[in-house]
Amino acid sequence: MGPPEKESKAILKARGLEEEQKSERKMTSPENDSKSIQKDQGPEQEQTSESTMGPPEKESKAILKARGLEEEQKSERKMTSPENDSKSIQKDQGPEQEQTSESTMGPPEKDSKAILKARGLEEEQKSESTMSPSENVSRAILKDSGSEEVEQASERKMTSPENDSKSIQKDQGPEQEQTSETLQSKEEDEVTEADKDNGGDLQDYKAHVIAKFDTSVDLHYDSPEMKLLSDAFKPYQKTFQPHTIILHGRPGVGKSALARSIVLGWAQGKLFQKMSFVIFFSVREIKWTEKSSLAQLIAKECPDSWDLVTKIMSQPERLLFVIDGLDDMDSVLQHDDMTLSRDWKDEQPIYILMYSLLRKALLPQSFLIITTRNTGLEKLKSMVVSPLYILVEGLSASRRSQLVLENISNESDRIQVFHSLIENHQLFDQCQAPSVCSLVCEALQLQKKLGKRCTLPCQTLTGLYATLVFHQLTLKRPSQSALSQEEQITLVGLCMMAAEGVWTMRSVFYDDDLKNYSLKESEILALFHMNILLQVGHNSEQCYVFSHLSLQDFFAALYYVLEGLEEWNQHFCFIENQRSIMEVKRTDDTRLLGMKRFLFGLMNKDILKTLEVLFEYPVIPTVEQKLQHWVSLIAQQVNGTSPMDTLDAFYCLFESQDEEFVGGALKRFQEVWLLINQKMDLKVSSYCLKHCQNLKAIRVDIRDLLSVDNTLELCPVVTVQETQCKPLLMEWWGNFCSVLGSLRNLKELDLGDSILSQRAMKILCLELRNQSCRIQKLTFKSAEVVSGLKHLWKLLFSNQNLKYLNLGNTPMKDDDMKLACEALKHPKCSVETLRLDSCELTIIGYEMISTLLISTTRLKCLSLAKNRVGVKSMISLGNALSSSMCLLQKLILDNCGLTPASCHLLVSALFSNQNLTHLCLSNNSLGTEGVQQLCQFLRNPECALQRLILNHCNIVDDAYGFLAMRLANNTKLTHLSLTMNPVGDGAMKLLCEALKEPTCYLQELELVDCQLTQNCCEDLACMITTTKHLKSLDLGNNALGDKGVITLCEGLKQSSSSLRRLGLGACKLTSNCCEALSLAISCNPHLNSLNLVKNDFSTSGMLKLCSAFQCPVSNLGIIGLWKQEYYARVRRQLEEVEFVKPHVVIDGDWYASDEDDRNWWKN
């Protein structure tokens, strides 16, 4: 059941520009476009799978590209017909894949990836009256020529474009190019005698298929996508042959229409002629819980011909199943007890038959074409064998814009609607489905008609749907705005059915479902002026679907609002079988994303007032506080919250367009991390951040977005001058920066890893120069901001609140350093901390820094980590450090390539320095000689050094003796870190003896990964009971073992132990030491921080520790443990500890807690 290691994914895409042939009233008539498309084989590529309203995972997919131009005809009456978009599809198939045997029960270990690329040059013939330039197409979209059955029923204003004439060249290496006629004749020649033997039965079946689908499908079978689909099952380089094609995409983009076209194409002799039989199953038309054999299912599709069924089963290698809407069966395909059927005569629940076909247990030699929504794609991966994935996308960007704008005559209104449309990329993406595009068009027209009377928000899909649905209800009775009792029953029943469908992953409903919710089709039709619920299916029993899945999500969300009506609860049984609304908060459940956002959108006060009018009762949704609480949980779990969770919450709040509701949800936010990928992310974040009035720190990761402005791509749709189509991206960025500068409690802004153009940096710095900006700490670590540094230097002396600047990993040329130092020396510059880690500093750069150190009295901390400091550079720095005018207190020279010679120069300079209190020399090979020179400095009575970091400095042998001597008689040094040095048990004994001296004032000792064993633990236990000053001891990643910790606990149990922080992470501990450790915790009132991560504790051992954590004597506040590493019983006990002692924090990231400026040299 596990997913394959590699999956073959082909994404058929075609994006076209469309022109509209208008009637004489519009006075336009474009010519037909001719296009040529080349298809060649290319390397494997990765494609991100689309998901509904949610971020996608990156998947390795083969990308099928084609570009085409589309034209549209409009009759004078604007009569509508199904849209026939010309599509071009490319199929990529990658080599070096192994084919799974046809009888294999599971997915192959390696799925081949096929890559067929099509690239076309496009030319647009413009009519004299249409002066817009052609769209710059940057990616490909597969556009279905037809729309799904739902779209055909709901699409009242979709126009039917003409088919473009296209010529396609296929380059397949040594293979010869063939025309469609040659390909077709070749396939016909390959039809075997067995096909001819089927005689009249086969012809009758094909006639039945044609009669069934010919009225609902209109497609040209020589179109590019059909030619490419006809080759989809062909072996690639004789190494891999797909047996399953998966057509996936957003709801409503035309997957079902494409599936029906495939079946019809076979019946008409245009497609898949090597297949003797093609059987079509519509999942929405099948009651999959009923029992049947596969033969009986096929017989329903082949009326009055059981002999034909037998013939079909005799040739499974020439049998193609087309299964439409497999995701409608998701709820039953996920059962753990799924069995497999291998006999086509055995009666099983129909979902078992479908599952067995997917797994190739049933008719393993047959072929499958499956349609599914993007949200169902991940679950499908573990079921299919030898798959080829094809992405189906809907209307192109230009087509969507044209459909929305075609009924807006006023030019200023067109521009306003156009801008609001492209601002909201999620709303615009939803319009890829023709049915949604039609609903949006109707909503916009209704809003225009209502004018000032329309108070509902129009920036969101919730606002548009609310406008459309609620006014469809109220417009029926101008004199009576409220719903009658019967109408209320109908509306609430519809909402309940929609919610039940969302939770159970059902989008198809039957007569029994309508009865369960007191619904009648006639009453639904009478309640709305629009087709909310549509009849679909060709069988005797009708089934129903919402005109689009997003409408089902809307009504499902409305259910949770209506359940708060106490008056209404007397008439209807709410929540009988429904899930709690708090389950909607799970962002990883893609089926809930749409309903969740609509639910937030319905919290808008104007929408709630409209509902009050409809029901004649105050609407005070009980769900409002629950939603605000869910958002506040993100604020409380900063370390465990991903930036995508925060952004998802922001989008939900933005959907409401209600400032009071948003402010209540965000009042607890103090830290935020945002990942900005889309333009709309900026607008949504700006809207929400201005309500985070208690925000203190924000991290923003924004890449690529501000380097290219794609807004103008859609401008040709609007018939205005190009200069009027002003790019809005920088305006949105300016608004975002303005919000950051206006938050009165915001102190830290981290733009690390971001990519900001010169213009973006200019806008940012101008906003941060505002007097209202209170930001003190500004970080650009690893950000690409070099082109805009000149704007940053002006900010340094324009904002006197700025105290900290981090430019780590920013290449600093000498000219940059000159401007930076001039700004830092400015009288109005208040910067106290400057980090220039990995800035590629030169000797000239060091000279300018040295001059800076004696020219400013404000700079207190300087980091030059990961810059090479040679002898000449050290001489310059030494001259500055020895000057009485240098007031620097903290110096970080981590990984600067220091040698004993350069260390000698540094120490000589420090002898004259009475201000330096913090020094970090980590990751420099100082050796014994360098440490000896440092100890001479520590011996100096005027040495003010308090914190010394010597991690990974290759300190060996006698060096520890020198350190021990200096520690024993130094009353100023309080913190020493020797992490990742080979201290060993012998040197540890020397250090312990020094720490026991009353003249040693060391408070913190870091000894992580120092090759210590259990043999030093007796010395450590004795030391911690003797010293009165040591408060923190980190022994992590040392093999102390159970015996060592048991010995150490003897010291912890003593009342004389004043240790407050102890690190025992990754010390090879087991449950054998838990008894002693629990006892030490229970009787030690001083210990408040303990790290136990990466040890091997059993459940019994952890339960002992949990009992000790709850002991009243224990004052532990920070416990380093990963809860998810343990069984449910242990997790519950750890949660009980946090409940009993609310101040206790149990988290595996123990080092994140930076008490007492412990990580000063890292920050």
UniProtKB/Swiss-Prot annotation:
A molecular function (GO) term: ATP binding
Residues the record lists as binding ATP: 249-256
Entry keyword annotation includes Mitochondrion: yes
Disordered, as annotated region: 1-201
LRR repeats, residue ranges: 801-822, 830-851, 858-878, 887-906, 915-935, 944-964, 972-993, 1001-1022, 1029-1050, 1058-1079, 1086-1107
Induction: (Microbial infection) Reduced by T.gondii in the testes and uterus.
Name listed for the protein in its UniProt record: NACHT, LRR and PYD domains-containing protein 5
Annotated organism of origin: Mus musculus
Lineage of the organism: Eukaryota, Metazoa, Chordata, Craniata, Vertebrata
Encoding gene per record: Nlrp5
